[in-house]
From Swiss-Prot:
This protein's encoding gene: rpsB
Disordered as annotated region, ranges: 260-282
Protein name (Swiss-Prot/TrEMBL): Small ribosomal subunit protein uS2
Annotated Gene Ontology cellular component terms: cytosolic small ribosomal subunit
UniProt cross-references to PROSITE patterns, sorted A to Z: RIBOSOMAL_S2_2
Family membership noted in the UniProt record: Belongs to the universal ribosomal protein uS2 family.
């Protein structure tokens, strides 16, 4: 039995998910998901009764990928979303692109992998206390490192192309959508009234401009992913109560990226107290 996060139509409405774009900007393919028009502002109103079940299906898809130990890539480069995308992806131990999407990030993964290796080499050079490079040379390397880290930092540990994408605003991220479609990678995406739903595996009709709406989508996505990870661990015999507060990390072993658990500081402190108490009772 899945333990997906709970969400209601009221939750969606309170986050402004139902507000679409001006009617002049609409994509007719989104008509099935539009409730009507706000007469004063002349914007489309999204039918949240349609959004809710589609959202639940999409969250179940993310849960399933996480349960199987798959890689999930969060994509959102618009200014309303970039920081939320990064923090929520990190919270569930997954990956993200929150600045400019570089063409070929998926379809030319070999080149991207080489760039990631270069990034790591730069970091190694900069962390070498015995480096014989001049201050100017190190400064140039630092600039190159920062540029690569901004573009690739969120996927540096991914190890291979993702198993599914979670996208905010398919119009802005059209290159990511195109590459995912070409490779047959499933897409979970927020689609506003000006978006094209064709080829989107799991579409979620909703406002893709409001920070409050974006925060809700990303939180639900992350909570669904964490639920999938926890269910997978529970199936392996790990008690869920034992992993609360732990950090989930991705490690590569024998070419396979696996989700692993790093015990939290609180857990370690509690464990230390138990050992101390046992010693005192002897």
């Amino acid at each position: 039995m899945t333990n997906l996060p709970k969400v209601t139509v009221r939750d969606l409405a309170e986050s402004g998910v139902h507000f679409g774009h001006k009617i002049s900007r609409w994509n007719a393919k989104m008509a099935p998901y539009i409730y009507g028009v706000h007469q004063e502002n002349r914007i489309h109103i999204i039918d949240l009764r349609k959004t809710l079940p589609l959202l639940q299906v999409a969250m179940k898809a993310l849960y399933d990928v996480a349960f199987q130990g798959g890689r999930i890539l969060f994509v959102g480069t618009k200014f309303q979303a970039f920081d939320i995308i990064a923090s929520e992806a990190i919270r569930c131990g997954q990956y993200y692109v929150n600045h400019r999407w570089l063409g070929g990030m998926l379809t030319n993964w070999g080149t991207v992998s080489s760039s990631i290796k270069t990034l790591m080499q730069y970091e190694k050079i900069l962390n070498d206390e015995d480096s014989i490079l001049t201050k100017k040379e190190l400064g140039n390397i630092e600039k190159k490192k920062q540029k690569l880290d901004k573009a690739l930092g969120g996927i540096r540990e991914m190890g291979a192309i993702p198993d599914i994408l979670f996208i905010i605003d398919t119009n802005k991220e059209h290159i990511a959508v195109k590459e995912a479609k070409k490779l047959g990678i499933p897409i979970v995406a927020i689609l506003d009234t000006n978006s094209d739903p064709d080829g989107i595996t799991y579409l979620i009709p909703g406002n893709d401009d409001s920070r409050k709406s974006i925060e809700l989508y990303c939180k639900l996505a992350t909570d669904s992913i964490l639920a999938g990870i926890e269910s997978s661990l529970a199936k392996s015999g790990v008690k869920i109560d034992d992993i609360r507060g732990d950090e989930f990390i991705q490690e590569k072993e024998d070419g396979i990226v696996q989700t692993k658990r790093r015990r939290s500081k609180v857990y370690k402190e509690e464990e230390r107290e138990v050992v101390t108490n046992e010693d005192e009772s002897r």
